UniProtKB/Swiss-Prot annotation:
Residues 136-374 form the Radical SAM core domain. One of its GO terms (molecular function) is aspartic acid methylthiotransferase activity. Coiled coil: none annotated. Residues 376-444 form the TRAM domain. It catalyses: L-aspartate(89)-[ribosomal protein uS12]-hydrogen + (sulfur carrier)-SH + AH2 + 2 S-adenosyl-L-methionine = 3-methylsulfanyl-L-aspartate(89)-[ribosomal protein uS12]-hydrogen + (sulfur carrier)-H + 5'-deoxyadenosine + L-methionine + A + S-adenosyl-L-homocysteine + 2 H(+). Its cofactor is [4Fe-4S] cluster. It is an enzyme of class 2 (transferase). It is found in: Cytoplasm. InterPro entries: Elp3/MiaA/NifB-like_rSAM, Methylthiotransferase, Methylthiotransferase_CS, Methylthiotransferase_N, Methylthiotransferase_N_sf, NA-bd_OB-fold, Ribosomal_uS12_MeSTrfase_RimO, rSAM. GO terms for cellular component: cytosol. The gene is rimO. The lineage of its organism: Bacteria, Pseudomonadati, Pseudomonadota, Gammaproteobacteria, Lysobacterales. This is Ribosomal protein uS12 methylthiotransferase RimO.
Amino acid sequence: MNPVKNQVPKVGFVSLGCPKALVDSERILTQLRVEGYDIVPSYDAADVVVVNTCGFIDSAVTESLDAIGEAMNANGKVIVTGCLGKRPEQIREAYPQVLAVSGPQDYQSVMEAVHAALPPRHDPFVDLVPDYGIKLTPRHYAYLKISEGCNHRCSFCIIPSMRGDLVSRPVDEVLCEAERLVRGGVKELLVVSQDTSAYGVDLKYAERPWRDRMYQTRMKALCEGLSELGVWTRLHYVYPYPHVDDVLPLMAEGKLLPYLDIPFQHASPRILKLMKRPGAVEKTLQRVQRWKAMCPEITVRSTFIVGFPGETDAEFESLLDFLDQAQLDRVGAFAYSPVDGASANALPDPVPEEVKQERLARFMAKQAEISALRLEAKIGSVQQCLVDLIEDDIAVARSRADAPEIDGLVHIQNGGELGLKVGDLVDVEITDSDEHDLFGDALPANVVPQQGRALNLQMV
C-alpha cells in the first residue's frame, strides 16, 4: 500500500455521527487537501483510511466499530478519531492493529498520524482548496459549528465526557467563516453546537470586531451578524432558556429563519429532574405560546425520550398531553436505551422493552396527527423553498420550516418544466400535503438561481 515515489498520497475517509462530527471531518479533510493529499472514495484506492467515529449511543458505537473493521479488512491501514476515540481501549481490544486513536476535534493528532503513515507532498495544493475549505454537504448549505462541548450533565448523555465542557469560538471567527461560505455559494447556514443558547458564556460574552462594528460573543449578537449575510440561517440545539426570546424579533423581521430546534426531552417534572433537565413544564408551554405570538410563522422542532427509567403510565400520558397543548411542528423521538458511562444507568425501575416500543409507537402516531394537520393548514399558501434534488421532472426542496435530513420535503411538481436546479430558491404555491411533506407548483417569476461553487466530496 506504500505510494510510489512522487505519486500523490491518497487518503480514504469515513465520517459518522452528528453534524458537529461532520464539521470535524470537513476540517480534517481541508487540512489534508492543503497538504497535498488526495481524498479518494474507495478503500482500494487509499494508502491510509481515517475513520471519524460516533460514540453517543450503543448503536452508534456498534456502527463505528463495524466501520473500523470494514476499513481494516479492506485496507489495513486505519487511523481512528472522533467520539469513540475517547475509549481507545475499546477500539484497540477489537482492532489492535489500528495505526492511531484520538478523540474528537483533535485535528493535530490525526494529522500527525497521517504524516507518520503517509508523508505529505512537498508541493501542497493550497491554491486548489477554496478559502471556505472542504465541505461534505451539498454546495448550497453548510453546517456552522460555533462551539465545542457542553456544560450540562444530563443523566442520559455522555457527550461532556467525550467533548468536554463548553468552549465557544470567538464571534468574529464564526462570522468570518460564515462570510467565506456565503461567498462560495452557500445559501443556508445551519448553526450547530451542543448548546447554542449557551454560546459565549465561557468567554464572558467578550466583544470582537467584525465589519466595522463590535459584536458580543453571544447568541443574539451572532444571529444579528449572520443576518447581515442575506442567506437562510437556521438555529439548532437550542436550550429553552428565557433569553431565547431575544432572537424572536429577528425571526419576525425575516432576518433569521423562523425555526427553533429545542430538545425538550419530556414533559413530566419528575422525569425531567431524573434526566437533570429544565423541568418547569408550564413555563415551557407558556414560552412556546409566546414564541408563536411573537412570530406566527415560527416552526418549533423538538426531540423526546420515551421509556426513561421510572416513567409511569401516567407520566407517559402527560407527555402525550404536552404534544396536544404545545402543537409542535416537527418532533423526533427514541426509546430510551442505556448508554455506557451514563449516570441514568443506575436509576431504578427500568421500563420493559416491549412497553418502551409501544409507547414510542403511540407517541409518534400522536405527533403524526398533529404534524399532518399543521401541514394541511399550509395548503393554498406560498412558501419560499430551497431546491435539494432533481428527480425526473420533480424538484425536491425544503421550505423555511424544514432542516435537511431531519424534517420534511416540498415536492415541486413543475420543477423539471421550469428547469429548476439544485440550490435554486423558489416560491412554491402549496397544493397538497401529507403527514410529512408538502406538494406544490413553483411560481416561475420568483426563482433565485444558485451561484458559486463549493468543492463537494463524497464520504467513503
